[in-house]
Amino acid sequence: MLLAIDVRNTHTVLGLVSGTGEHAKVVQHWRIRTEAEITADELALTIDGLIGDDSETLTGVAALSTVPSVLHEMRGMFDQYWSSVPQVLIEPGVRTGLPLLVDNPKEVGADRIVNCLAAHHRFGSACIVVDFGSSICVDVVSAKGEFLGGAIAPGVQVSSDAAAARSAALRRVELTRPRSVVGKNTVECMQSGAVFGFAGLVDGLVERVRRDIDGFGAAGVTVVATGHTAPLILPETHTVDRYEEHLTLDGLRLVYERNRADQRGKARATR
C-alpha cells in the first residue's frame, strides 16, 4: 500500500493507493487543513491517526508540499518515523519524467508537475490541466509529455474570502450555485460572481491556450480538471472534458514508481 501526501497552502489530501501500474487505485483518502507551523511529530501523529492499522501495510510513501515549512518537517518525519519505508519526496532533483520547457524549472510547483504527468499518462495526448485549488492553475503538456507552462489565478474560495475581508459591506458566504446569475441579495451576488465568474475565467483561459499554442486547437487535446472546488464550477463550463478527483495522488504514485524502478535498476547494475 502506497501512502500519497499532497500538501497545499490551505488543505492537505492524503490517499492510500492499492496496486501498481494500470491496476493502481485510491482506496481511501482524507482532506484536512494545512497547518504551516506543524512539526514533524505532529504531522506523524496526524497521519498515523488517519491511516490507523494501514500503517503496518505501507510499502512506500510519496509526498509533495507547496508549503516550504511543511516540506522541511516532512523530511524530518520521514527520517524519524518512516526511515524503513521507501520514500519519494517531490522536489528539485527528483526524476519525474516530465521535461519542463520553461524559463526556470525550479519555480514550477510540484503539484503542477505531477498533475501534468498524470494527465498525459492517463490520456496519452496533449492536455490542458485545470487544478481548482487555493489557486487555479491552467497548465499545458504537449503530446510528447513536455510541460510547456501555464497560467495561475487566485482560487475561488481565496478570492471570495478576500472580497469579504476587504469590504465592510460584504461577508464570507458559502460557495454554492445561486438561483440565477442575477443575484437578488448580497449572498447570491457573491455566489454568482464566484461560480459563474470563475467558470468564465477557466473557459477563457482554455480557449486562449487552444488559440495561441500550435496544435492545441485540434480535437485530440484533452482538457482535464481536478481539485476540491472543481465539482462546483465545472457544470457551468463548456471547455473541460474530464474530471479526475485523484489526479494529483495518481501523479505522486507515478513519480514514486519511476524513482523506485530507477533505484532497483542501479542496485542490479552494481552487483
Curated annotation (Swiss-Prot):
One of its GO terms (biological process) is coenzyme A biosynthetic process. It is an enzyme of class 2 (transferase). Belongs to the type III pantothenate kinase family. K(+) binds at D131. The active site is at D111 (proton acceptor). NCBIfam families: baf, PRK13318.1-3, PRK13321.1. Its cofactor is NH4(+); K(+). This is Type III pantothenate kinase. ATP binds at D6, V7, R8, N9, T10, H11, T12, V13, S134. A monovalent cation. Ammonium or potassium. Keywords: ATP-binding, Coenzyme A biosynthesis, Cytoplasm, Kinase, Metal-binding, Nucleotide-binding, Potassium, Transferase. One of its GO terms (cellular component) is cytoplasm. It catalyses: (R)-pantothenate + ATP = (R)-4'-phosphopantothenate + ADP + H(+). The gene is coaX. It comes from the Bacteria. Homodimer. Its EC number is 2.7.1.33. Pathway: Cofactor biosynthesis; coenzyme A biosynthesis; CoA from (R)-pantothenate: step 1/5. Substrate binds at G109, A110, D111, R112, T186.
